[in-house]
Amino acid sequence: MRTLVIGGGAAGASAAARLRRLDDNMEIIILEATDEISIANCGLPYYCSNVINSRQKMIVSSTKRFKDLLNIEVRLNSKVTKINRKEKTVVINNSETINYDKLILTPGANPVIPNVKGINHPNIFTVRTLRNADDIKSVLARDAKNAVVIGGGFIGVEMAENFVHLGLNTTLVELSSQILAPVDTEIAAHAQNEMRRKGVNLLLSDGLKEVDGEEIVLNSGKRIPFDIAILAIGVRPETTLAKECGLKIGALGGVKVDKNMRTSDKHIFAAGDSVEVEDFVSGKDTLIPLAGPANRQGRIIADNIKGIKSTYKKTQGSAVVKVFDLTVANVGNNEKQLLKSGQKYLKTFIIKPSHAGYYPDATPTLYKFLFTQKGEILGAQACGYEGVEKRIDVIATIMRNNGTIYDMLDSELCYAPPYSSAKDPVNMLGMHAENIINGFVKPAFYNDLKDSVLVDIREQGSFDSTIEASVNIPTSQIRGRLNEIPKDKKVILFCNTGFQSYVASRILLQKGYTNVYSLSGGIELYHILKENENAEKELTLV
């Protein structure tokens, strides 16, 4: 039996390796269109800046290793130009024809290249292959001073950081009003503040119009000089072969597969960035170009080829990215997605230290949590300096097992002062959600502050700044100053992070107040959003 694998990236290599471990007699051939196989694509931005200083480290496996260890033949520079499903053959480089019993289609995705004037400038690159990175390093070695990154996704943000690491004047341009689309504006604002503090010229709500000589011209008319530019505005599934041979393509442009990763042809499987998968939260088809899911899908294909009933159980979209000193992580749906899908939801923000506050060097982490009135988990996001991905991973695991906010509340997690608090942030998110569901607290948010009575409940002398037009009534005095708090108006209480205002709101709710809210995330989140907002306003004045 012969199995052909088209594409030697994460999904293809994973499928081939698993298949060999299950069957030592099968003939397995990987057909790779480029001269590289199984490279660490996700590390390319760090290789470009010499944070990863060895090219060899970027090669996860070699053709020799595949042959010596797994007895898998890898053919480089072997572009499949046609699939003949009826005859079960493929054509390589428009010349050689080879037959298959099973075919695994993992061609990946192509970077989006806008059709604008000057886009073929020799110093404009995408970051998809090791060859791309080599070319980028070659330009950087020629005393490059100005870098422009078009696109504020994960790769764009990572490339901007690594250009700054090399000492380049760096501009990042993003067409949307925020970077990092998988998270919401509040989490993105924290990351945007960090990028600006580190020296990135961040231009949001603006896009590439054309390239004029050695300048990037934006839709706004701004002109940015560059020695090197990166296109990181997204990817599209590579489906040319699939379309030409008549495989079913989904509404989002990816190859349609079932839960066994089988295409509309029972002899052809597909995985990785080229396929559409089912979203864990919404149940709708989605495109998730991530290495983790691609590797799992490859393994599932191998199992099914060998008769092991293995299914792909939807995609949660768990992701993490380094933004200078910050870490941003997320799982599930964000608020934008929930609004678009019509899913009803509740939300809360908390800011908690990375470990026990009394132990040295604790740093704050901002969390956003989305859930339903029934306690179902819809999504979580976090941004901080330490332990961020650890908490999101725990929530992702609870979600994967169809757990609820009550499972978060009850989770027994590791604790010692250098690592966490007795009530871990995962526990605290569950507790906050439970309080909201039970009506013990009504959360208010940044956009709710207008036309509300604002009460700063922090103790006098314990703070340097407050929210404009607020009055200060400390929690310790609130029972004796009820006459200063109106019952006929919306009242929003706030403190540093939201805990004291929750306590104060409980007092008022039990004193007959019904229109009392606690500012979720407190004034610390308010300051994060204000800093970002003011930075954007300053740009409009330039």
What would you call each of these model-derived segments?
Residues 406-417, 421-453, 459-492, 496-542:
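Rhodanese-like catalytic fold shared by cysteine-dependent sulfurtransferases
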Residues 98-108, 226-234, 298, 375:
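Short hydrophobic core segments
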Residues 1-73, 112, 161-183, 318, ...:
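Beta1-alpha1 glycine-rich phosphate/pyrophosphate-binding loop at the start
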Residues 1, 7-8, 21, 274-385, ...:
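Mid-to-C-terminal Rossmann-like scaffold of FAD/NAD(P)H-dependent oxidoreductases
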Residues 59, 146, 154-210, 290-293, ...:
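Rossmann-like dinucleotide-binding cores of NAD(P)H-dependent redox enzymes
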Residues 120-143, 214-217, 223-300, 394, ...:
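FAD-site-proximal beta/loop scaffold in flavoenzymes
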Residues 107-166, 201, 257-259, 471-481:
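Glycine-rich dinucleotide-binding loop and its adjacent helix/turn
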